Amino acid sequence: MDPYMIQMSSKGNLPSILDVHVNVGGRSSVPGKMKGRKARWSVRPSDMAKKTFNPIRAIVDNMKVKPNPNKTMISLSIGDPTVFGNLPTDPEVTQAMKDALDSGKYNGYAPSIGFLSSREEIASYYHCPEAPLEAKDVILTSGCSQAIDLCLAVLANPGQNILVPRPGFSLYKTLAESMGIEVKLYNLLPEKSWEIDLKQLEYLIDEKTACLIVNNPSNPCGSVFSKRHLQKILAVAARQCVPILADEIYGDMVFSDCKYEPLATLSTDVPILSCGGLAKRWLVPGWRLGWILIHDRRDIFGNEIRDGLVKLSQRILGPCTIVQGALKSILCRTPGEFYHNTLSFLKSNADLCYGALAAIPGLRPVRPSGAMYLMVGIEMEHFPEFENDVEFTERLVAEQSVHCLPATCFEYPNFIRVVITVPEVMMLEACSRIQEFCEQHYHCAEGSQEECDK
């Protein structure tokens, strides 16, 4: 029997609950007025709501610039592969959903951590000798975002801190700060294909550090860490006894010239909570099915972390049951050709975009190795009329109707993030417009006229 299934009966021992609505001798004991409460309206948002802040929304929503009405808008800012319709999921995936819906078996509640059969499928799919998994090691969630939310909630208390990459996915900070958790930013190095500055990372760790977040492959960088670099990260975590939250939502989405290494396959010493989901690899972000894989071969987490994840998952009573019902077919029947074609398209677009932008004076793109993005440095000294990356992107929208995300959204100013999921024709047009924009606004830095005359 699934150890997480709780059987309730009328003879169960439930905690007593004080009910103030009782009658004694036919008279109500409910007081006419509660002491200490002033009878006037005073409804205010909670501290958690007030501390919740999404940098992307704050920056993008405050951009007042309208696109050029003479040019069709091209958005290179949204990390949703379904937006343009050129990257549909595989027919086997949609058929699996139809079959699950038509069966009528998945219209009710499931255990809050997911059906046992669905967790068994995930465990089987990701199991390997270097990182064995069973159903008890899997928590199903409402998307990878909720998986990250649960991991932070189970590992860190208010007043503790977590280590987050810079540049990095803004949701880490949004979730952590809403819980009263301090965020410490460790640097990724563009000159080293966005590897972690390991010395700075280790320097940030203190007695209040609750976990280290490692995002590989990376959003927003499109980088993929080598096996050797991952081993160095694990060595830091092992030395400092810091557990890892591995955001691996883009796992296996790497280009043909490199290899993806799941972090848990490289260590038996460091406890790891790996977060993933259907959203990106299967191109269905709206279906909201994610998971946490608990890797803890030395039993450092013990029962408390596992039980904590179960309790936290009960706050929303689990992810969509219909998607859970389709999960076996999605995992088993999606053809390898689907994954190959998706990655071939992304690599082709990445090469196209990188080549075009690298030829533009004043821009310094960093070649990606996976995921759906690349980062582009702006040599701001050559664009003196713009104060920062936010102004650069605002004017790019106003003049060329091309929208990229300023990397200030990812705590990394004077870069922009480009999404590479758009159709090829659109990518070519966007790069052409970016070139035109840069040529119009580029200025030689003082003392470098010779370079400009080339």
UniProtKB/Swiss-Prot annotation:
Q: What is this protein called?
A: Tyrosine aminotransferase
Q: From its record, what is one biological process in GO terms?
A: response to oxidative stress
For whether the record's keyword set contains Transferase, the answer is: yes
Enumerate the cofactors the protein uses. Answer: pyridoxal 5'-phosphate
Q: Which residues carry this modification: N-acetylmethionine?
A: 1
Disease involvement? Tyrosinemia 2: An inborn error of metabolism characterized by elevations of tyrosine in the blood and urine, and oculocutaneous manifestations. Typical features include palmoplantar keratosis, painful corneal ulcers, and intellectual disability.
Supply the CDD domains for this chain. AAT_like
Q: What does this protein do?
A: Transaminase involved in tyrosine breakdown. Converts tyrosine to p-hydroxyphenylpyruvate. Can catalyze the reverse reaction, using glutamic acid, with 2-oxoglutarate as cosubstrate (in vitro). Has much lower affinity and transaminase activity towards phenylalanine.
Catalytic reaction annotation? L-tyrosine + 2-oxoglutarate = 3-(4-hydroxyphenyl)pyruvate + L-glutamate
Q: Which residues carry this modification: N6-(pyridoxal phosphate)lysine?
A: 280
Family label? Belongs to the class-I pyridoxal-phosphate-dependent aminotransferase family.
